[in-house]
Design a protein with these regions (language model features):
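Short helix/turn-capping signatures at newly exposed starts of structured segments
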Residues: 1-140
Length: 140
């Protein structure tokens, strides 16, 4: 573990959305791929709770969750203060209408629940504020 962790890669979020993977690591990948492709994690891998079988691998604003040796989810946080391995790129200035257009283009559904907008597509969940500010992207 490094004293000051820095991401070994930086990717644009739209690349992650389009490929639903991070440098080839995707849901269903062997857990060993995480370290092979991403390098050293920011913190040691830890269980979500004492009795949980789910292990969290933290890489800046990205959490890889694994269970029984396989990746089961990838969460990308845009509200936290961690180093950004995944950046917003051009979509950083998007508003609600832009996200609506993307969801229509991809054939994804858009739901609004108590001021949180959620775009749901095959294996991806994108969460936005009612103003269209991106908070979380989850690959499942």
């Amino acid at each position: 573990m490094n004293d000051k962790w820095t991401p070994s890669i930086n990717l644009d979020l739209m690349d992650v959305i389009n490929t639903q993977s991070i440098k080839g690591v995707q849901v269903g990948s062997p857990e060993a791929f995480i370290f092979e492709i991403m390098g050293e994690a920011e913190l040691p891998a830890t269980r979500l709770s004492k009795k949980s079988k789910i292990i969290n691998h933290l890489y800046g604003n990205v959490n890889f969750l694994s269970e029984n040796g396989y990746v089961i989810a990838i969460n990308i946080d845009f509200h936290g203060n961690r180093e950004k391995m995944i950046t917003l790129g051009d979509i950083g200035s998007w508003g609600v209408n832009d996200w609506f257009e993307l969801s229509e283009l991809k054939g994804w559904s858009l739901n609004n629940l108590d001021g949180v907008m959620r775009i749901l597509g095959g294996g991806i969940v994108i969460e936005l504020s009612k103003e269209g500010e991106l908070s979380m992207v989850s690959l499942r």
